[in-house]
Amino acid sequence: MEKTFAMISLGCAKNLVNSEQMLYLMSEAGYTLVPDPEGADLAIVNTCGFIDAAKSEAIDNILEMAQLKKAGKLGGLIVTGCLAERYKDSIMSEMPEIDAVLGVGSFGEIVSAADAVMTGRCTSAFGDNSAPVDEIPRVVSTGPGWAYLRIAEGCNNFCAFCAIPFIRGRYRSRDMENIIEEARDLAAHGVKELIVIAQDITRYGTDLYGKRCLAELCRRLSEIDGIEWIRLHYLYVDQFDEELIDEIANNPKIVKYLDIPIQHINDHILKIMNRRGTGEDIRVLFKKLRERIPGLVIRTSLIAGLPGEGEAEFEELCEFLKEARIERVGVFPFSPEEGTPAAKMEHVDEEEAQRRADLIMELQATIMDEFCQGFCGKTIRVLCEGYDEEAGMLYGRSYADSPDIDGQVFFKGSCRDGDMTSVRILEADDGILYGEEI
């Protein structure tokens, strides 16, 4: 008899990789993935527990599955991931509809949990989140033509506003040979763009090899046949070195797009948030990167309303954005996370934090529009991702666009999904480029 399950993956790209690993393990064990949880034997909700909005989304999804279960339209409910890990002592007692819970160190136990639930047993598992990273194959759910490549787990930065080190554990690099083997397999299955991810990729190798190894890893990834783009997320200001900058500048397969989350520019705020480096360090690095890497696109993330941010500190941040002309910016209002030092600090109210975040995005919209207009009349490489019926055009991404968070390129042409092609840009509107294949 067929055993079916539905997967709901929430949160970041790193969590999606865990979902893809569970998809592989479940399919190997004879379970069949179905698109709709209604009527399925099991639903797996892989949760995020990072900020309040993410926790609310996770709880809403769990409760929705619980309602299906109560109505007899779903067999069992398994909850995994960061929310499960963060509230491991209480989640099953507070939400008794849940049949099984797995923490972030126990994704490999998904089949055992599923089998238990299928036989009417409740179970939970919380592994050691300081253990080496599990090397589990995955079913890639992204694309066409691209995939995430996670190179490490956990984080050692302990920023005052962030709970990730407490949830995901200390920083653990994956073995380089395992990463290369996975990348080769992805390339063999048509992946042309590798999006290299970890909480801090610039720290890669320091725990395993006693030195920073991201530049070496990028060199080896670029030697793999079929890989055309290597995109880097997330790099930290204090971990850049000359070898890495040289590799990014000189390796044609590394796209000239760097995601460097800075959160703020004011020295006082950086210090009390336990961010390494100063505002001047950020300015100097960005200047150096732009001088050494022509055409570089920088993405960063910012937090508005952090503890210590008054009008003067906020104005300093806005002035920095006007000067730095950062092409891609994500901004979030400060969300006090329980258990973190910042949650105990005095900060602006939620409404004011949101107002400041909105002002930053208004400012950034002008900068982004100027940047996008600069593509008009130019020919750029685009990774084709599909056909939009409503627009009557193909669409994809340029080197300046990371999936889900940046813009897209719509164009007329005849290439296939997952192919790289050249597109002449004719128009730019609200962060979207329009053109034609040549």
What residues fall within each predicted segment?
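Structural recognition of alpha->loop->beta junctions
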Residues: 93-108, 215-227, 250-255, 316-328, ...
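Conserved SAM/AdoMet-binding glycine-rich loop
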Residues: 77-81, 86, 188-312, 322
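Proteins enriched for Cys/Gly/acidic motifs involved in redox and nucleic-acid/cofactor modification
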Residues: 1-204, 243, 258, 281-291, ...
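Short, hinge-like loop/turn segments at secondary-structure boundaries
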Residues: 95-96, 117-120, 212-214, 248-250, ...
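Terminal RNA-binding accessory module
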Residues: 336, 344-438
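Conserved, mostly hydrophobic/aromatic
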Residues: 159, 179, 196, 232, ...
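Generic beta-strand/beta-sheet core signal
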Residues: 8, 197-199, 233-235, 261-263, ...
